[in-house]
Regions:
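Residues in well-ordered alpha-helical elements
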Residues: 67, 79, 91, 98, ...
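Short, histidine-centered active-site or binding-site loop motifs used for metal coordination
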Residues: 88, 143, 181-182, 211-213, ...
Length: 326
C-alpha cells in the first residue's frame, strides 16, 4: 500500500509509521513539526529527532491546507490517506479557536478534495473520544455524541465531513474512523496529564489533580498504534467507526498516586474538576476486537512504569531534571 500519513512525526504518528514501514508499506509523511507553543523549542527539537530515528519515509514539512499538497498526491499516488494531524487537544483549541478551526477543518477538507481528485481508495480519520461528551463506562461507537468544547465539536464535524465525502464517491473512496482516548507514553510532550504527573513526581513536586474522581481510559501509545495499523490494513473496516483504547477507566487520583509510587517522590493535591472537560469513562472495543483482532496489552501499571523508565534513560530528561541519582 502507498499510505500518506499526516501528523506522522507526532506521538502516535511516528509509532504508526514505523509499524507500516516494517510491514513493507510505502509511506510518505506530511507534518509541520510544530507544537503550537505548548513546550520549549529544545524539547520539541529533541522529540522530533528521537521520533524520526529509523524512519525512512520522506517528510514534507508543510501545512495540509497548502496548495502544495496537490503535488505530493500527484507524485506519491497514495491509495490510502491516514489523517492524524490536528491541534493536540481541547486546551490548545480553546486558546486558539480560529487557528484550530483552520487546521482541523480546512486542512481536512483539502485532504478530502485531494483524495477524491487523485483516486485514493481508503481514508483513515483519527478522531477522539472527546466526541462523546460526558459518558460512563462501556460507551460504544453508536452512542449519541454530545461533544463539549471546540476540540470535540471539530472532531465530530470532521467525522461527518469524512462520511459525506465518501458517500458522494459511490464506493470508490471508503473511510475508517478511529476514536482513541488519553494516549500516553515515551516521546510524548510534557504538557499532557500523564506527562505532567510523571514529571512532577520525578521532580518531587505536587501533582495537581483536577477532579479526584474523574476517570480516563488511559491508552499506552504502542496499543493505540497497533490498533490504528490494524484498522488500516484490514479489509473489514470500510465505512466503520472504532474505539481504540485500553477499555479500562482509571481515576485521575489513582493515576497520580501511581506516578508518585513509581517515582518514589512527590505528593498529590486534589482540586475541583475542570468544567471545560467532559466526564469520561472507559470505551467499549468489542467492534475492533471482532473485526481486526485488536488486543491492547499494556495496562496502566505497566504503561506508567515503562514511561517512567523512559524518563530515567532519556539523556535529555536526565540532564534537564538532574536524574542521575534516581
Amino acid at each position: 500500500m502507498n499510505i500518506l500519513v499526516t501528523g506522522g512525526c507526532g506521538l502516535i504518528g511516528h509509532n504508526v509509521v514505523k509499524r507500516l514501514e516494517s510491514a513493507g508499506h510505502n509511506v510518505s509523511i506530511v507534518d509541520t513539526m510544530t507544537d503550537y507553543g505548548i513546550i520549549p523549542k529544545d524539547e520539541l527539537d529533541h522529540l522530533i529527532h528521537e521520533r524520526m530515528k529509523g524512519i525512512k519515509s520522506t517528510i514534507h514539512p508543510i501545512c495540509i491546507s497548502s496548495p502544495l499538497m496537490n503535488g505530493i498526491f500527484e507524485k506519491f499516488k497514495p491509495d490510502t490517506v491516514m489523517h492524524l494531524a490536528s491541534f493536540p487537544r481541547q486546551k490548545v483549541v480553546n486558546a486558539n479557536p480560529q487557528a484550530g478551526a483552520k487546521v482541523m477543518s480546512e486542512g481536512l477538507l483539502n485532504l478530502l478534495e485531494m483524495s477524491t481528485k487523485h483516486g485514493v481508495k481508503k481514508f483513515i480519520y483519527i478522531s477522539s473520544s472527546m466526541v462523546y461528551g460526558d459518558f460512563t463506562d462501556d460507551v460504544r461507537e453508536d452512542a449519541v455524541c454530545k461533544p463539549q468544547g471546540q476540540y470535540g465539536i471539530l472532531k465530530l464535524a470532521g467525522e461527518w465531513l469524512v462520511k459525506d465525502y465518501t458517500r458522494r464517491t459511490n464506493g470508490s473512496l471508503t473511510h475508517t474512523i478511529i476514536r482513541p482516548s488519553a494516549v500516553y507514553g515515551p516521546l510524548d510532550v510534557e504538557d499532557r496529564v500523564i506527562s505532567k504527573f510523571m514529571l512532577a513526581a520525578l521532580r518531587g513536586n505536587t501533582l495537581k489533580v483536577n477532579g479526584a474522581g474523574e476517570t480516563l481510559d488511559f491508552t499506552y501509545v504502542d496499543d493505540a498504534a497497533d490498533g490504528i495499523v490494524g484498522a488500516t490494513i484490514s479489509d473489514l473496516t470500510a465505512n466503520k467507526t472504532y474505539n481504540i483504547t485500553k477499555s479500562h477507566s482509571w481515576t485521575l487520583l489513582d493515576a497520580a498516586n501511581l506516578a508518585v509510587k513509581i517515582a518514589g517522590s512527590g505528593s498529590v493535591e486534589c482540586r475541583d474538576r475542570d468544567p471545560d472537560f467532559p466526564s469520561r469513562g472507559a470505551l467499549n472495543i468489542d467492534a475492533a476486537r471482532k473485526d481486526f483482532g485488536f488486543n491492547p496489552l499494556i495496562d496502566v501499571d505497566d504503561g506508567f512504569r515503562k514511561y517512567h523508565n523512559w524518563f530515567l534513560t532519556s539523556t535529555y530528561w536526565k540532564n534537564k531534571l538532574n536524574l542521575s541519582d534516581k
